[in-house]
Amino acid sequence: TGLKIETLPDKSLNANGPGRTDHGNFVLNDVRMYATDQEKFDAKKHRITLSGARADFTQTGWPAKNAIDGKINEGKKGTGWAVGPQYGKAHQLILTTSKPVAIKGSTRLQVVLDQQYGSKHTIGCFRISARTGQSPGDGISQQIVKILTIEAGERDDKQAEALFNLFRS
């Protein structure tokens, strides 16, 4: 189980986004998830631990795993996930929970996207989906999962082409 966060291009954003900067980038510093069947959320009691992160593309120095490392400092002192220089394109971040989440009746989910890299490095258009299932790689081949664990700048041409073909499909 986990979350899928899709950042989406939009004509209303500079460079078609998906971020709000002039060039379309964003920095997602931290993602937190909470679940409860009660009316109010207790940050300590209802927090769901996110233990895995991967993305279809990561900016050098800003990998997917940084979106769940808990470091929420502002600007370059912080960490996060970013997608430069692939602006104007849809991207996805898949987060997995450390253990399955038991859903009973009407469970409320709260997802917090923390974005502290200046005033414009925020996501302009996005979609969040809750994921269920046993495999964190549902819908993504093991070859692609393995490639996504490699920093973008360290991938060879064949690996980059495999990701491009997946993205294009």
Regions found by a protein language model. Name each.
Residues T1-I5, A102-L113:
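Noncatalytic modules at the cell exterior or secretory-pathway interfaces
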Residues N29, L93, L109, F126:
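Residue-level detector of short, conserved catalytic/binding motifs and their immediate flanks
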Residues K40-T49, Q115-Q116, T122, R127, ...:
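Substrate/cofactor-recognition hotspot
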Residues E6-P9, V112-H121:
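Short beta-strand-plus-loop segments that form exposed binding edges in beta-rich domains
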